[in-house]
Amino acid sequence: MVLEKLKEENTVIALIGASNDKQKYGNKIYCDLRSKGYNVVPINPKEKLIEGDKAYTSIEEMESLPDIANFVVPPPVAMKITPHISELGIKHLWFQPGSESKELETWLKNTEGIKYLINSCIMVETR
């Protein structure tokens, strides 16, 4: 279901953990999706710009909610913010390899209405 949402026209992706550090996947994923024409919005509480584009400190700052939240953050951060993001009404969640945990997987399985991908790289899926 998340892959289908990704293929819809005008889908907005919030990249939680976007980074200016070219060595980090938060930067690689952001640049990759942007180069492929995806509407990707960088989320990072410590940055004002990511690759010259306005970065938001949180999803709530965005002008409208994204269709997909893509996580490229450590597992404790993903677990901490996922319930809140779900409560906002974002139901398509994508967890990059390394952002998941057993606790998160259990929460996702026990939460109705959430469509999610774990251990699947968005750069690979969009080739």
Predicted ranges, named:
Residues 59, 63-99:
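Mid-chain, well-packed structural core segment of small domains
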Residues 38, 88-92, 111-114:
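A short helix->loop->beta-strand "cap" motif at the edges of active sites that frequently abuts
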Residues 50-53, 67, 103-106, 125-127:
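Short, charged, surface-exposed secondary-structure boundary motifs
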Residues 52-60, 114:
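Active-site regions of enzymes building and remodeling cell-envelope glycoconjugates
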